[in-house]
């Protein structure tokens, strides 16, 4: 089974709130009423009978804030931020090093970072 949820309340988001004085833009009530991190999603999967076998993430979009690309305060920067993420994804595919991208995402997930929490799990029998 594949499960992907937003990775909100992660360290890089908290840093953006504190250092850049940005609002907690990831809070979206009533759209999102439950928030997960790697630990809480893993616990849920185990509780309902699944064994997590692999975890990973997606591009850490909030890292762009640390590089001076503020897509939160400047809404016009949103599409450009998205394009930067897409360019990063396509770069690794273009040079036939997709495995490097997967290793980067795995490492980010090991640090609790990345835009999403992704688990591949199998049903415990």
Regions of interest found by a model, annotated:
Residues 38-58, 90-97:
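A SAM-dependent methyltransferase catalytic signature shared across enzymes that methylate proteins
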Residues 2-4, 21-23, 85-92:
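A generic short-segment signal for beta-strand/edge and adjacent turn/coil regions
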Residues 18-22, 71-74:
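Short, hinge-like loop/turn segments at secondary-structure boundaries
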Residues 1-20, 30-50, 118-125:
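Conserved SAM-binding loop
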Residues 25-28:
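Glycine-rich FAD cofactor-binding loop and adjacent beta-loop-alpha segment at the N-terminus
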């Amino acid at each position: 089974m594949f499960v992907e949820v937003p990775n909100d309340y992660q360290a890089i988001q908290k840093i953006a709130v504190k250092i850049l004085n940005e609002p907690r833009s990831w809070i979206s009530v009533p759209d999102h009423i439950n928030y997960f991190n790697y630990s809480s999603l893993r616990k849920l999967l185990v509780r309902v009978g699944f064994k997590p076998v692999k975890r990973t993430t997606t591009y850490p979009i909030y890292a762009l804030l640390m590089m001076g690309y503020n897509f939160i305060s400047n809404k016009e920067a949103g599409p450009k931020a998205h394009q930067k993420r897409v360019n990063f994804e396509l770069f690794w595919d273009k040079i036939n090093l997709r495995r490097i991208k997967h290793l980067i995402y795995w490492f980010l997930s090991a640090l609790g970072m990345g835009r999403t929490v992704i688990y591949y799990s199998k049903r415990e029998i």
